Amino acid sequence: MKKIFLSFAIGLCAFTGQSQNIKEILLYSQENMNGTARFRALSGAFGALGGDFSALNVNPAGSVVFSNNQVGFTISNYHNKNNTNYFGTSANETDNSLDINQLGGVYVFENEDKSSGWSKFAVALNYDNINNYDNSIFVAGTNSINSVADYFLSYANGIPLSVVSGNDFNYGDLFYNEQQAYLGYQSFIINPTDTNPGTTTYTSNVAPGGNYYQENSIVTSGYNGKLSFNGSAMYKDRLMVGVNLNAHFSDYRKSTSFFESNNNNTSTNYLVERVRFNNDLYTYGNGFSFQIGTIYKATKEFRLGLAYQSPTWMRYTDELSQSISAVSSNVNEELAADVVNPRLTMIYEPYRMRTPGKITASAAYVFGKTGLLSFDYGVKDYSNAAFTPDRDFRDQNDLVANVLGVSNEFRLGGEYKIKRVSLRAGYRYEESPF
């Protein structure tokens, strides 16, 4: 369950632009606790254990721990409940989805050359859904300060009237900030201070006085998947080494529908009474990363693990469509809605992102066939994330480097077997990168 507190209108609107920012870095860099049932029960503390498909995502040396060939998959139910509070008004939204979050197979074989110290090898192919984006949030409340008009004014001021007063046919030629100004002007939410085509200042056409009732519905869906091509080997039954070559693919959709209404107008002038603003964002991409890892059996019971996950080099494309409708009225009548729908999907230039790498150190103690205790410590420096090339995103990258920092992660897991019953428990703590 998530609790979300929002305190100003522009935050409520959650409008999306073609502006890469810290939010995107976190969206595509952070991972959910997904994987096999055993992996999740132990909170993912598998870096020194191996022998589990999802453990390959922590330490690629773990595939050689399998004693025989295996195929496995895991289906999970995702449940999100979001509670929101906006200017004292509470709301909640629940989302459930069912998805395959792990699918893989491993082939294990012994070395027929008995004189070699390399006694065992394994190759594996595994898919992990490292992040599920299915979620929904609903926010509602009365804003005593800001109107949606403030959003459009923030983009419009400085843009000539001649740019935003054209017809829909030139909408696709406008920059993002010009498109927002266009939508606000064409729906009569904002007006120019005069009719000169060179005018660059605008005013709100929404009645002043506050008490703006606002709703925002945000629905997201998609996944961040990783397909790992794995190879590992065991040396003298003590040292295990492995490598993953990972193909990444991401699919993210976000739809927002913002509504605002007021009854502030007490004059005969026509002012905006209601607004509905819809945004549909689709982001998709693919990329590459690699992992190397080792597990060492210090004794029959005690194991140590160390793994490195490289940065992920991704290439993304954003597609965005927007529409808006506004209803104006005075004390005597209400006009028909002014609807602005360019019926155009903007496909922006692809951009590249480098997510941060990660180092994981692990230790585990195995009590024969009775049980085990396992601990993982991971460190990830989010300040190393960046959009590339740097010359095009210098301001954004400077912000990432200055605002984000190191995030430490601790995972602890335990298992105890009673005949055919396994009792499992785990604990995971991950610091905020801020």
List each language-model region with its residue ranges:
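Active-site-proximal flexible loops/turns
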Residues: 9, 66, 253
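Outer-membrane beta-barrel porins/channels
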Residues: 20-34, 39, 108-434
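Outer-membrane beta-barrel translocator/receptor signature
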Residues: 37, 49-58, 64-137, 142-143, ...
